Amino acid sequence: MKVDLDWVHHKLQEVVNHAYTPFSKFKVACMLVANNQAFYGVNIENASYPVTLCAERSAIANMVTSIGKATIDYVFVYFDTKTPTNSPCGMCRQNIFEFATDKTQLFCIEKDKSFKQFTIPEILKGGFRSYEQ
């Protein structure tokens, strides 16, 4: 599948407006592709900080709610900030790992359209699974 990063960037710029970030103002949007379907998520902050939900986990919850367990082919994470070199937090990396394969592609996309591309094993060495995939 050829990835149209311009389209993804444009779509996630729209989706990120739904992020609820009254505390940090650090808006993030995520799009997962699984079974040739797109699933979206945004970060949702809470006054009780540990309750905050990251965009990646929000998108995974959307996917599982919509179609059940599926294998993620692509993860696109958009950071609406001027801070360069963003990437998913450790908790999100482990959560993505649960639904990914070694071939799953992760794109970290910045506001200025610059991006970094990774495979899941590159960003999470020794991820934990309680079952064989």
Curated annotation (Swiss-Prot):
Give an example GO molecular function.
cytidine deaminase activity
- Name the keywords, alphabetized: Hydrolase, Metal-binding, Zinc
Q: What reaction does this enzyme carry out catalytically? A: cytidine + H2O + H(+) = uridine + NH4(+); 2'-deoxycytidine + H2O + H(+) = 2'-deoxyuridine + NH4(+)
EC number assigned by the record: 3.5.4.5
Source domain of life is Bacteria
Pfam families in UniProt: dCMP_cyt_deam_1
Q: Name one GO cellular component term.
A: cytosol
Q: Which cofactor does it need?
A: Zn(2+)
Instruction: Detail which positions bind Zn(2+).
Output: 54, 89, 92
Q: Name one GO biological process term.
A: cytidine deamination
Q: Which residues bind substrate?
A: 43-45
The CMP/dCMP-type deaminase domain is annotated at 3-131
Reply yes or no: does the keyword Zinc apply. yes
Catalytic residues as annotated in Swiss-Prot or TrEMBL: 56
Could you tell me which InterPro entries the record lists for this protein? APOBEC/CMP_deaminase_Zn-bd, CMP_dCMP_dom, Cyt/Deoxycyt_deaminase, Cyt_deam_tetra, Cytidine_deaminase-like
Give the co-factor note: Binds 1 zinc ion.
The similarity comment for this entry is:
Belongs to the cytidine and deoxycytidylate deaminase family.
Functional note? This enzyme scavenges exogenous and endogenous cytidine and 2'-deoxycytidine for UMP synthesis.
Q: Subunit structure, per the record?
A: Homodimer.
Q: What is this protein called?
A: Cytidine deaminase
Natural source organism: Mycoplasma pneumoniae (strain ATCC 29342 / M129 / Subtype 1) (Mycoplasmoides pneumoniae)
